[in-house]
């Protein structure tokens, strides 16, 4: 009597270290949603909250629109610039609460917690998308192989 080969137990629980392609697609889509949430926060910010309309806000909204496209298409080779830009925005947000920055983010340093909280609906509401884009951007940079479009760009 021949012994039957024992089947290996299947690991049904997906590993966090290697996300499935479907999980990566959902992560990329969530990055798109948060990038567009950042754009919406700036576009619909109340005009009275920021005393000056600057080119920086325009640059920021356009850039996050482009960042949404990068993550939507899974262009892994371009994941690092959005991470750096988001980190820069976070730093400038907190620095602008203490120091008057020359390029239109704030005319004067903010004093007190209430003024900092009311600094700008757009800038304040952007904090959550920035944190998400920064943290998950680093995760995707390490775990996401990118889409098939990357192979096309390599040719």
Please name every model-derived segment.
Residues 2-155:
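Membrane-interface extramembranous regions
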């Amino acid at each position: 009597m021949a012994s039957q080969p024992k089947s290996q137990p299947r690991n049904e629980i997906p590993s966090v270290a290697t996300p499935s392609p479907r999980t990566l697609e959902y992560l990329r889509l969530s990055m798109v949603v948060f990038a567009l949430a950042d754009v919406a926060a700036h576009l619909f910010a109340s005009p009275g909250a920021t005393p000056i309309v600057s080119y920086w806000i325009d640059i920021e909204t356009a850039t996050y629109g482009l960042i949404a496209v990068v993550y939507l298409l899974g262009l892994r080779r371009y994941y690092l610039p959005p991470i750096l830009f988001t980190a820069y925005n976070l730093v400038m947000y907190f620095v602008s609460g203490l120091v008057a920055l020359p390029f239109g983010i704030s005319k004067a340093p903010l004093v007190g917690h209430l003024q900092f909280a009311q600094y700008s609906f757009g800038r304040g509401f952007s904090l959550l998308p920035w944190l998400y884009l920064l943290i998950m951007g680093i995760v995707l940079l390490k775990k996401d192989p990118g889409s098939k479009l990357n192979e096309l760009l390599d040719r």
